[in-house]
Regions:
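Bacterial N-terminal signal peptides
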Residues: 7-15
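Positively charged n-region of N-terminal signal peptides that target proteins for export
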Residues: 1-4
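Ligand-binding pockets and gating/stacking loops
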Residues: 19-414
Length: 414
């Protein structure tokens, strides 16, 4: 079987079996702040209380030999539908560099901002995607500036929905809003038309015009109408923001949106980690298990890659002392990701960490850039030539700006 690279993570050295079908969509459930791998996908029940903390228990999954954290009983019933990467690593313990590594596949520095994977897919789909919704959507907001287009340009950045999916009526801020009447919308479109006189990509203007009009007046806004779902379905996902965002993500994939970023916050648990996890882990368990099961039942799982993880993990050793009171710090040396769908075989564990979870023992997985490797599972070749050209343009612009600034400084000094 030809080596394939995971879309988004693109893990070096990772090779999961895939079938012939290519993925059409990606859903990234991004746990912003960094989830604890020892409490989720790589538990260490024999490592002692300083490692497992308040969660000594593990759950045997429906796949022999695979165990996960005790707070994820629903996910334990479907381990045959997903695989776990237990040895993701980039070594950074800083949020910004961690986000940048996992969202763009590159290390920070060098004066060039690389595009996020969602932006890369949006760029690849620029000529073939004819949907009325944006190609790259974040629920409800992108996790950082690195979700933008980088050197590809801002027209490929994430469209952030805003709003509250868990509310009785979910309204996408500034777009799907019942208070926006036709007159106000026509005024907005008139303002948008005025931008055509500015040096802005006309393709982007046309795209914005069509997308906004369809959002306001077209049938597409019904995709965000969760009242069309039965209460039993909404309860299955959980009434949390994460749960309802995952439900919207399923509806977006059904509508053909290529990339959906579901961002959930609160995972940066330096203090009172276990008190917070008592609520957050059951919410994740409901949301993610319902999403995978729902996609599978609707025949969408094989064509949709589902990924779940954060910018890094958390320290295996619990910080019991004040002021942390049972917290976990940042940890980029070893962390875990869940991968489902898209033709990837389920029921597998990739990599092995040490007994305490502090070191990678087998098959480290590091993020790499999509311009260096093709998004094989997504049916695309590398962006190498395009990326090189655009990086040169970006570097030339940066150099010209620095030279101009130096010139101004020289004039001021004389």
């Amino acid at each position: 079987m030809k080596r394939v690279y995971l879309t988004i993570i693109l893990t070096l050295g990772l090779c999961l079996g895939v079938n012939a079908q290519r993925a059409k969509s990606v859903i990234l459930v991004y746990l912003d702040g960094g989830p604890a791998q020892t409490d989720t996908f790589d538990p260490k029940p024999e490592a002692g209380r300083n490692i497992y903390g308040n969660y000594k228990g593990v759950i045997k999954t429906n796949v022999e030999g695979i165990e996960i954290g005790e707070k994820l009983p629903l996910l334990a019933t479907m381990a045959d539908k997903y695989s776990l990467i237990r040895t993701m690593t980039h070594g950074s313990n800083a949020h910004e560099t961690g986000h940048y590594a996992m969202i763009t596949g590159d290390s920070s520095g060098g004066g060039v901002v690389y595009p996020s994977f969602g932006a890369v897919i949006s760029y690849m789909k620029r000529d073939s995607y004819n949907g009325i919704l944006p190609c790259y959507i974040s629920l409800t907001s992108a996790n950082s500036r690195f979700n933008e287009g980088g050197f590809l340009g801002n027209e490929y950045k994430s469209f952030d929905t805003g709003g509250k999916p868990e509310a009785k009526e979910y309204e996408v801020e500034g777009v799907v809003n019942k208070q926006v009447n036709r007159q106000r919308m026509e005024q907005r479109m008139s303002l948008l038309n005025n931008f055509e006189t500015q040096p802005i990509d006309k393709h982007h203007i046309d795209s914005l015009r069509g997308v906004n009009m369809e959002f306001i007046w077209g049938d597409s806004r019904e995709i965000f109408n969760l009242q069309e779902e039965s209460d039993s379905v909404r309860q299955r996902y959980g009434k949390s923001r994460l749960g309802q965002s995952c439900l919207v993500a399923r509806r977006l994939v059904e509508a053909g949106v290529p990339f959906v970023n579901v961002r959930t916050t609160g995972w940066d648990t330096h203090k009172k980690h276990f008190q917070k996890m008592n609520t957050m882990l059951p919410e994740l368990d409901k949301a993610l298990s319902a999403l995978i099961a729902d996609l599978d039942a609707r025949g969408l799982l094989d064509s949709t890659i589902v990924l779940c993880g954060g910018e890094f993990g958390r320290t295996p050793a619990v910080l019991w002392e004040a002021p942390w009171n049972g917290g976990r710090a940042h940890f980029g040396k070893v962390f875990s990701y869940l991968v489902a769908g898209g033709g990837f075989h389920g029921g597998k564990v990739v990599g092995k960490s040490s007994e305490t979870g502090e070191k990678v023992l087998e098959r480290p997985g590091t993020p790499v850039r999509p311009d260096r490797h093709g998004l094989s599972a997504y049916g695309h070749r590398p962006l190498r030539h395009t990326a090189t050209h655009l990086r040169r343009q970006s570097a030339d612009t940066a150099l010209a700006t620095r030279q101009q600034q130096r010139g101004r400084t020289t004039l001021r000094n004389h």
